[in-house]
C-alpha cells in the first residue's frame, strides 16, 4: 500500500512546534521572534504570497513587519532598508520577496542580508555552511529543508546505505537538497538535463527527488519498486476535460502510475508546497533562539 504524504498535515505539525518554541523563548528570555518581509512593486502573486507569510508569522506569535516599496524604488534605498533591518535587534529574520522589479539587482540585496537573519537560506555564506556540513549555525533554503522533513519522517535521521537521486541542480533546490541528503549519510547522485540514461540512473534510487519543471517527466518505469518519491515540480498544464481553457497543476512525476510502484510519494499540489512557508517560520524561530543563546528546536 503506497503512502501519500499529506504536506498540509506535516506543515501543520511543523507550525505547532514553531508556536511552542516561540512561546517558550519569550517566556524564558523575553525575546519575541521577529520577521521582516520586504516587497517591492505590485505583482499580485507576490503580494498574495507575502500576505500568507505575514499571516502565518502572526499566527506563530512572531512580531511580523511588512515593508512595501514602490516598483521604482532605487537600489540604494532598498539596500538602506536591508541595512536598517540587519541592525535591528528585534528582527531575527529578513525576507526580500523575489523576483524584484527590473533594474534592481536582487543578488546584491540577498547577499547583503546578514547570514544569521537570512531565513530564505539564499546567501552564499549559508550555502557554504551547508556544503561543509555546518547545520548548527547555517540556515537552509526553505523548500529543500521541507522536503528533507518528509525524508526524515519516512527513513529516520540516518540514511546510511540508501541511494538518493536528485533530478535538478539549481542553487535554489537541487544542490542544497543533495547536500542535505549527503549530510544524512545517503549516497547521492545529482542528475540533470545533460545526464545520460536518466531513467536508468533514477531506477537505482531508494529516495528519488524530482525538481526540474518538466510536467510528469518521471514515469513508473523510472522508479525502483518501494522507493520514496519526492515531487518538487509545480507545472500548469491544459485540462480540457474540465472545460475550455482550464488548467490543472501537476508535478514532475506522473503521480497515478508512479503511485503503483513507489512505497511513499508526495502529491502535487499538497505535498512539498505547504512546507515552504512552514520552514520559513522554522528558520525564523531557529534564528531567534541562536541570537538569544538558546538551543533551537529540531524539525
Swiss-Prot record:
It holds the Pfam family THF_DHG_CYH_C. InterPro entries: Aminoacid_DH-like_N_sf (IPR046346), NAD(P)-bd_dom_sf (IPR036291), THF_DH/CycHdrlase (IPR000672), THF_DH/CycHdrlase_cat_dom (IPR020630), THF_DH/CycHdrlase_CS (IPR020867), THF_DH/CycHdrlase_NAD-bd_dom (IPR020631). The keyword Glycoprotein does not apply. Its EC number is 1.5.1.5, 3.5.4.9. GO terms for biological process: L-histidine biosynthetic process; methionine biosynthetic process; purine nucleotide biosynthetic process; tetrahydrofolate interconversion. Keywords: Amino-acid biosynthesis, Histidine biosynthesis, Hydrolase, Methionine biosynthesis, Multifunctional enzyme, NADP, One-carbon metabolism, Oxidoreductase, Purine biosynthesis. GO terms for cellular component: cytosol. Pathway: One-carbon metabolism; tetrahydrofolate interconversion. It catalyses: (6R)-5,10-methylene-5,6,7,8-tetrahydrofolate + NADP(+) = (6R)-5,10-methenyltetrahydrofolate + NADPH; (6R)-5,10-methenyltetrahydrofolate + H2O = (6R)-10-formyltetrahydrofolate + H(+). NADP(+) binds at residues 168-170, 193, 234. It comes from the Bacteria. One of its GO terms (molecular function) is methenyltetrahydrofolate cyclohydrolase activity. Catalyzes the oxidation of 5,10-methylenetetrahydrofolate to 5,10-methenyltetrahydrofolate and then the hydrolysis of 5,10-methenyltetrahydrofolate to 10-formyltetrahydrofolate. Belongs to the tetrahydrofolate dehydrogenase/cyclohydrolase family. Homodimer. This is Bifunctional protein FolD. It comes from Rhizobium johnstonii (strain DSM 114642 / LMG 32736 / 3841) (Rhizobium leguminosarum bv. viciae).
Amino acid at each position: 500500500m503506497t503512502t501519500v504524504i499529506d504536506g498540509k498535515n506535516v506543515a501543520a505539525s511543523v507550525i505547532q512546534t514553531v508556536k511552542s518554541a516561540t512561546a517558550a523563548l519569550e517566556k524564558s528570555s523575553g525575546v519575541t521572534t521577529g520577521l521582516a518581509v520586504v516587497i517591492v512593486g505590485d505583482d499580485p502573486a507576490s503580494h498574495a504570497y507575502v500576505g500568507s507569510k505575514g499571516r502565518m508569522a502572526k499566527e506563530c506569535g512572531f512580531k511580523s513587519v511588512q515593508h512595501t516599496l514602490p516598483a521604482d524604488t532605487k537600489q540604494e534605498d532598498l539596500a538602506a532598508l536591508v541595512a536598517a533591518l540587519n541592525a535591528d535587534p528585534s528582527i531575527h529574520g529578513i525576507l526580500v520577496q523575489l523576483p524584484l522589479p527590473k533594474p534592481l539587482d536582487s543578488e546584491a540585496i540577498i547577499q547583503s542580508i546578514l547570514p544569521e537573519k537570512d531565513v530564505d537560506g539564499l546567501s552564499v555564506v549559508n550555502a557554504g555552511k551547508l556544503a561543509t556540513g555546518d547545520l548548527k549555525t547555517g540556515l537552509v533554503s526553505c523548500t529543500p529543508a521541507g522536503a528533507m522533513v518528509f525524508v526524515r519522517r519516512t527513513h529516520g535521521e540516518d540514511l546510511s546505505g540508501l541511494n538518493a537521486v536528485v533530478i535538478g541542480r539549481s542553487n535554489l533546490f537541487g544542490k542544497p537538497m543533495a547536500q542535505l541528503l549527503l549530510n544524512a549519510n545517503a549516497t547521492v547522485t545529482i542528475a540533470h538535463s545533460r545526464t545520460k540514461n536518466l531513467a536508468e540512473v533514477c531506477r537505482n534510487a531508494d529516495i528519488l527527488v524530482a525538481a526540474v519543471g518538466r510536467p510528469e517527466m518521471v514515469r513508473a518505469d523510472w522508479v525502483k519498486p518501494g522507493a520514496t518519491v519526492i515531487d518538487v515540480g509545480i507545472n500548469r498544464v491544459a485540462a480540457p476535460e474540465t472545460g475550455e481553457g482550464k488548467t490543472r497543476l501537476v508535478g514532475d512525476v506522473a503521480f497515478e502510475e508512479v503511485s503503483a510502484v513507489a512505497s511513499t510519494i508526495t502529491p502535487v499540489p499538497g505535498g512539498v508546497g505547504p512546507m515552504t512557508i512552514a520552514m520559513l517560520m522554522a528558520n525564523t524561530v531557529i534564528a531567534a533562539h541562536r541570537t538569544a543563546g538558546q538551543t533551537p528546536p529540531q524539525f
